[in-house]
UniProtKB/Swiss-Prot annotation:
Localization (cell): Cytoplasm
Protein name according to UniProt: Urease accessory protein UreE
Gene3D superfamilies xrefs: Urease metallochaperone UreE, N-terminal domain (2.60.260.20), UreE, C-terminal domain (3.30.70.790)
Gene Ontology MF term list: nickel cation binding; unfolded protein binding
Family: Belongs to the UreE family.
Top-level taxon of origin: Bacteria
GO terms of biological process kind: protein folding; protein-containing complex assembly; urea metabolic process
Length: 175
Protein backbone atom coordinates (compact mmCIF):
# COMPACT_ATOMS: atom_id res chain seq x y z
CA UNK A 1 0.00 0.00 0.00
CA UNK A 2 2.93 2.36 0.43
CA UNK A 3 3.09 3.02 -3.33
CA UNK A 4 -0.32 4.68 -3.26
CA UNK A 5 0.52 6.87 -0.28
CA UNK A 6 3.93 7.96 -1.56
CA UNK A 7 2.97 8.88 -5.12
CA UNK A 8 -0.53 10.16 -4.25
CA UNK A 9 -2.14 8.45 -7.22
CA UNK A 10 -5.68 7.48 -6.34
CA UNK A 11 -6.95 3.95 -6.78
CA UNK A 12 -9.50 4.31 -9.59
CA UNK A 13 -12.63 2.28 -8.86
CA UNK A 14 -14.73 1.48 -11.94
CA UNK A 15 -16.65 -1.68 -11.05
CA UNK A 16 -19.39 -2.33 -8.51
CA UNK A 17 -20.28 -5.76 -7.17
CA UNK A 18 -23.31 -6.33 -4.98
CA UNK A 19 -23.35 -9.15 -2.48
CA UNK A 20 -20.64 -11.61 -1.63
CA UNK A 21 -16.92 -11.18 -2.10
CA UNK A 22 -15.70 -11.47 -5.68
CA UNK A 23 -12.36 -13.03 -4.88
CA UNK A 24 -9.64 -13.57 -2.34
CA UNK A 25 -7.88 -10.28 -1.78
CA UNK A 26 -4.87 -10.04 0.51
CA UNK A 27 -5.53 -7.82 3.53
CA UNK A 28 -3.38 -5.02 2.11
CA UNK A 29 -5.59 -4.93 -1.02
CA UNK A 30 -8.92 -4.89 0.85
CA UNK A 31 -10.12 -1.50 2.06
CA UNK A 32 -13.21 0.01 3.63
CA UNK A 33 -14.90 3.18 2.41
CA UNK A 34 -17.08 4.85 5.06
CA UNK A 35 -19.72 7.07 3.42
CA UNK A 36 -22.71 9.01 4.71
CA UNK A 37 -26.13 8.47 3.13
CA UNK A 38 -25.63 11.57 0.95
CA UNK A 39 -22.13 10.50 -0.10
CA UNK A 40 -23.44 7.08 -1.14
CA UNK A 41 -25.54 8.79 -3.84
CA UNK A 42 -22.51 10.35 -5.57
CA UNK A 43 -20.83 7.76 -7.80
CA UNK A 44 -18.03 9.92 -9.16
CA UNK A 45 -15.26 11.85 -7.47
CA UNK A 46 -12.44 11.60 -4.97
CA UNK A 47 -12.86 9.81 -1.67
CA UNK A 48 -10.59 8.57 1.09
CA UNK A 49 -10.54 5.03 2.50
CA UNK A 50 -10.74 4.42 6.24
CA UNK A 51 -6.94 4.05 6.33
CA UNK A 52 -6.28 7.24 4.36
CA UNK A 53 -5.70 5.95 0.83
CA UNK A 54 -6.90 8.17 -1.99
CA UNK A 55 -9.72 6.70 -4.09
CA UNK A 56 -11.35 7.95 -7.28
CA UNK A 57 -14.87 6.72 -7.96
CA UNK A 58 -15.74 6.37 -11.65
CA UNK A 59 -18.72 4.08 -11.26
CA UNK A 60 -21.62 3.53 -13.64
CA UNK A 61 -24.77 5.37 -12.62
CA UNK A 62 -26.76 2.45 -11.22
CA UNK A 63 -28.35 4.00 -8.17
CA UNK A 64 -26.93 4.81 -4.75
CA UNK A 65 -24.21 2.68 -3.21
CA UNK A 66 -25.33 0.42 -0.39
CA UNK A 67 -23.37 -0.78 2.63
CA UNK A 68 -21.69 -4.03 1.63
CA UNK A 69 -21.24 -3.08 -2.03
CA UNK A 70 -17.77 -3.98 -3.25
CA UNK A 71 -15.91 -1.61 -5.53
CA UNK A 72 -13.08 -2.82 -7.75
CA UNK A 73 -10.42 -1.19 -9.85
CA UNK A 74 -10.03 -2.01 -13.55
CA UNK A 75 -7.44 -4.74 -12.94
CA UNK A 76 -9.51 -6.12 -10.05
CA UNK A 77 -6.50 -5.96 -7.77
CA UNK A 78 -8.21 -3.83 -5.09
CA UNK A 79 -11.47 -4.49 -3.27
CA UNK A 80 -13.11 -1.59 -1.45
CA UNK A 81 -16.15 -2.37 0.70
CA UNK A 82 -18.69 0.42 1.24
CA UNK A 83 -19.74 0.93 4.85
CA UNK A 84 -22.32 3.34 6.25
CA UNK A 85 -20.51 6.06 8.19
CA UNK A 86 -22.02 7.30 11.44
CA UNK A 87 -23.67 10.71 11.13
CA UNK A 88 -25.66 13.04 13.40
CA UNK A 89 -29.32 12.02 13.45
CA UNK A 90 -32.57 12.76 15.21
CA UNK A 91 -34.52 9.87 16.75
CA UNK A 92 -38.26 10.56 16.82
CA UNK A 93 -40.60 8.63 19.11
CA UNK A 94 -44.26 9.08 19.97
CA UNK A 95 -46.85 7.88 22.47
CA UNK A 96 -48.93 6.29 19.71
CA UNK A 97 -48.49 4.75 16.29
CA UNK A 98 -50.83 7.40 14.86
CA UNK A 99 -48.62 10.25 16.13
CA UNK A 100 -45.56 8.59 14.59
CA UNK A 101 -47.41 8.07 11.29
CA UNK A 102 -48.44 11.74 11.30
CA UNK A 103 -44.82 12.75 11.86
CA UNK A 104 -43.72 10.53 8.96
CA UNK A 105 -46.45 12.09 6.79
CA UNK A 106 -45.33 15.65 7.54
CA UNK A 107 -41.66 14.81 7.04
CA UNK A 108 -42.41 12.97 3.80
CA UNK A 109 -44.38 15.98 2.60
CA UNK A 110 -41.12 17.92 2.97
CA UNK A 111 -39.13 15.25 1.08
CA UNK A 112 -37.12 14.41 4.19
CA UNK A 113 -35.17 11.15 3.98
CA UNK A 114 -36.29 8.79 6.75
CA UNK A 115 -35.10 5.54 8.23
CA UNK A 116 -38.11 3.66 9.59
CA UNK A 117 -38.12 1.38 12.61
CA UNK A 118 -40.79 -0.15 14.81
CA UNK A 119 -41.62 2.67 17.21
CA UNK A 120 -39.23 5.31 15.87
CA UNK A 121 -38.11 7.37 12.90
CA UNK A 122 -34.57 8.50 12.17
CA UNK A 123 -33.66 11.54 10.09
CA UNK A 124 -30.62 13.71 9.53
CA UNK A 125 -30.15 16.28 12.28
CA UNK A 126 -31.94 19.52 11.40
CA UNK A 127 -32.83 22.16 14.00
CA UNK A 128 -35.91 23.43 12.10
CA UNK A 129 -37.36 19.93 11.77
CA UNK A 130 -36.47 19.17 15.37
CA UNK A 131 -38.44 22.23 16.53
CA UNK A 132 -41.43 21.28 14.34
CA UNK A 133 -41.46 17.72 15.70
CA UNK A 134 -41.17 18.87 19.31
CA UNK A 135 -44.03 21.35 18.75
CA UNK A 136 -46.18 18.36 17.77
CA UNK A 137 -45.46 16.75 21.15
CA UNK A 138 -43.03 14.12 19.85
CA UNK A 139 -39.97 12.93 21.74
CA UNK A 140 -36.85 13.89 19.80
CA UNK A 141 -33.32 12.95 20.79
CA UNK A 142 -29.97 13.27 19.08
CA UNK A 143 -27.89 10.23 18.21
CA UNK A 144 -24.98 9.38 15.97
CA UNK A 145 -25.07 6.22 13.89
CA UNK A 146 -25.12 5.01 10.28
CA UNK A 147 -28.15 6.35 8.39
CA UNK A 148 -29.95 3.95 6.04
CA UNK A 149 -32.95 5.87 4.69
CA UNK A 150 -35.78 4.38 2.68
CA UNK A 151 -35.21 4.51 -1.07
CA UNK A 152 -38.46 6.26 -1.93
CA UNK A 153 -41.64 5.27 -3.72
CA UNK A 154 -40.15 5.54 -7.18
CA UNK A 155 -36.83 3.82 -6.51
CA UNK A 156 -35.07 7.16 -6.44
CA UNK A 157 -32.23 8.33 -4.33
CA UNK A 158 -32.87 8.61 -0.62
CA UNK A 159 -30.97 11.90 -0.69
CA UNK A 160 -33.83 13.94 -2.19
CA UNK A 161 -34.20 15.56 1.17
CA UNK A 162 -34.14 19.14 2.45
CA UNK A 163 -30.92 20.11 0.67
CA UNK A 164 -32.27 20.80 -2.84
CA UNK A 165 -32.70 24.21 -4.40
CA UNK A 166 -35.13 23.53 -7.23
CA UNK A 167 -38.78 24.51 -7.05
CA UNK A 168 -41.61 21.99 -6.98
CA UNK A 169 -44.85 22.68 -8.80
CA UNK A 170 -46.97 20.83 -6.26
CA UNK A 171 -48.22 22.09 -2.94
CA UNK A 172 -46.79 21.09 0.41
CA UNK A 173 -49.86 22.20 2.32
CA UNK A 174 -50.92 19.90 5.13
CA UNK A 175 -54.54 18.99 5.73
Amino acid sequence: MSDNVSDHKPIVLEHRQVGEAVGDFPPDRRLQLPLTAEERTVLRGRRCSDCGLSLLLQLPREGPLQPGDRLLDRSRSWEVVVIAAPEPLLRVQADSVLELLQAAYHLGNRHVALELHDGELLLLKDSVLEAMLRSRGLRVSACERPFLPEGGAYGGSPSHAHRHSHVHSHSHETP
